[in-house]
């Protein structure tokens, strides 16, 4: 059976030169991952040990008021804590005791480090061990850092999941583990496709509830659904699990190759694969074709933001007819992103890390049709006449798998259509 996909390029970007940037960054910190994780993990609570700035960021980004009692909060470090005039550990213990007595539904508590807690060297790992012993087994306490000193944007989820992996039960069962947080409707689509292929049992990390936590062992194979999970990938590998490498499921091609890699691992016949995927593939291809009319022939520049950039560049160049000038990403994990880089034709600059002033200079020099960047850069670039796309939308919007492929292309087409309308109106 032929997958009826375009042939790979003669030379991809996996083994090409990478421009290493180590300057000023313009990205959100890892605390932002809490915004989608607290919705996914329904018996978890994320307690940020940080400042009022951390609290304002989370409240604003989540779009909820604190009296709504979301599954996150901030233990505020006051001036006396920062000055070493108070026992921050004792105060943290009291806050946790108060929280758990008020919220008996909590089964997983995450102590999340921030810039202030990192600066005063508050040992949240030891605090988590102490509090787990005190409140277990009903509540397990984890810790990870979302500090802007240590992490960028999507690394918060990676650090969170990596903190869970060592505590997962051991198993000898042959299971597929899907790793990465997805909106429930998208996760259901993925599981439905895999189940229709006859693949199972299928487990998910993160689980909705602590009691549903997957096991892991030498017969576990795992597929990542997000490309920013390098630390989690390493933690699972150390537990004996094996990674199924594949392009990420963005667009029709990426989804098909992701599913095919898993299907091959589980011995699914070509005929069965065609039977299950033919209809959703056709829908995805039609939806992408409609949305990509605006994108064909346009040039693209990615600022580093989420680590989705190489996978999205592959989708936009191969399925939407765009050309990439530069593909920037905060970190480049070739073991994870290699299959996508193989399909990204040689040509664009691949940059890792950020030196924002130099990258802005390169945008001005190359004048791309579309620039994908963070919120803080978008308005200044728009004021200079560049068309921009907010990178954060690509994380908070459902964009994975067949049914969202057209929406994904549409996210990039929308700012170009808006710019064209504004130009027509200005000409009139």
From Swiss-Prot:
GO terms for biological process: light-independent bacteriochlorophyll biosynthetic process; photosynthesis, dark reaction. [4Fe-4S] cluster binds at residues 29, 54, 115. GO terms for molecular function: 4 iron, 4 sulfur cluster binding; ATP binding; metal ion binding; oxidoreductase activity, acting on iron-sulfur proteins as donors; oxidoreductase activity, acting on the CH-CH group of donors, iron-sulfur protein as acceptor. Its EC number is 1.3.7.7. Transmembrane segments: none annotated. Pathway: Porphyrin-containing compound metabolism; bacteriochlorophyll biosynthesis (light-independent). Its cofactor is [4Fe-4S] cluster. The keyword Endoplasmic reticulum does not apply. InterPro entries: LIPOR_BchN/ChlN (IPR050293), Nase/OxRdtase_comp1 (IPR000510), Protochl_reductN (IPR005970). It is an enzyme of class 1 (oxidoreductase). Gene3D superfamilies: Nitrogenase molybdenum iron protein domain (3.40.50.1980). Binds 1 [4Fe-4S] cluster per heterodimer. The cluster is bound at the heterodimer interface by residues from both subunits. It comes from the Bacteria. Keywords: 4Fe-4S, ATP-binding, Bacteriochlorophyll biosynthesis, Chlorophyll biosynthesis, Iron, Iron-sulfur, Metal-binding, Nucleotide-binding, Oxidoreductase, Photosynthesis. It catalyses: chlorophyllide a + oxidized 2[4Fe-4S]-[ferredoxin] + 2 ADP + 2 phosphate = protochlorophyllide a + reduced 2[4Fe-4S]-[ferredoxin] + 2 ATP + 2 H2O. NCBIfam families: DPOR_bchN, PRK02842.1. Component of the dark-operative protochlorophyllide reductase (DPOR) that uses Mg-ATP and reduced ferredoxin to reduce ring D of protochlorophyllide (Pchlide) to form chlorophyllide a (Chlide). This reaction is light-independent. The NB-protein (BchN-BchB) is the catalytic component of the complex. Belongs to the BchN/ChlN family. Protochlorophyllide reductase is composed of three subunits; BchL, BchN and BchB. Forms a heterotetramer of two BchB and two BchN subunits. This is Light-independent protochlorophyllide reductase subunit N.
């Amino acid at each position: 059976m032929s997958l009826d996909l375009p042939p790979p390029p003669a030379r991809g970007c996996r083994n090409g030169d990478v421009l290493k940037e180590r300057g000023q960054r313009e990205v959100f910190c890892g605390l932002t991952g809490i915004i989608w994780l607290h919705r996914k993990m329904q018996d978890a609570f994320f307690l940020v040990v940080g400042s009022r700035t951390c609290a304002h960021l989370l409240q604003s980004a989540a779009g909820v008021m604190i009296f709504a009692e979301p599954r996150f909060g901030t233990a505020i470090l006051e001036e006396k804590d920062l000055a070493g005039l108070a026992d921050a550990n004792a105060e943290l213990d009291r806050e946790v005791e108060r929280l758990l007595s008020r919220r008996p539904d909590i089964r997983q508590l995450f102590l999340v480090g921030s810039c202030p807690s990192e600066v005063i060297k508050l040992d949240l790992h030891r605090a988590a061990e102490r509090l787990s012993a005190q409140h277990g087994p009903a509540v397990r306490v984890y810790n990870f850092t979302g500090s802007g000193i240590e992490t960028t944007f999507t690394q918060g989820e990676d650090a969170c999941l990596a903190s869970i992996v060592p505590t997962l039960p051991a198993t000898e069962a042959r299971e597929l583990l899907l790793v990465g947080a997805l909106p429930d409707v998208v996760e259901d689509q993925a599981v439905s496709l895999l189940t229709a292929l006859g693949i199972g049992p299928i487990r998910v990390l993160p689980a909705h509830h602590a009691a549903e936590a997957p096991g892991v062992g030498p017969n576990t194979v795992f597929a990542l659904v997000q490309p920013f999970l390098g630390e989690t990938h390493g933690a699972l590998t150390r537990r004996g699990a094996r990674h199924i490498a594949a392009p990420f499921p963005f667009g029709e091609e990426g989804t098909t190759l992701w599913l095919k890699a898993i299907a091959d691992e589980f011995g699914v016949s070509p005929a069965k694969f065609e039977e299950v995927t033919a209809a959703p593939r056709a829908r995805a291809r039609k939806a992408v074709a409609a949305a990509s009319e605006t994108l064909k022939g346009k040039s693209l520049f990615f600022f580093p933001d989420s680590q989705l950039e190489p996978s999205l560049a592959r989708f936009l160049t191969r399925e939407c007819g765009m050309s990439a000038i530069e593909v920037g990403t905060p970190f480049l994990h070739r073991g994870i992103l290699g299959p996508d880089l193989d399909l990204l034709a040689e040509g664009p600059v691949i940059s890792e890390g950020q030196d924002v002033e130099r990258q802005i200079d390169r945008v001005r020099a190359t004048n791309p049709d579309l620039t994908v960047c963070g919120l803080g850069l978008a308005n200044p670039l728009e004021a200079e006449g560049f068309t921009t796309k907010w990178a954060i939308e690509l994380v908070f919007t459902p964009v994975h798998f067949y049914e969202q492929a057209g929406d994904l292309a549409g996210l990039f087409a929308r700012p170009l259509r808006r710019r064209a309308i504004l130009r027509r109106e200005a000409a009139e």
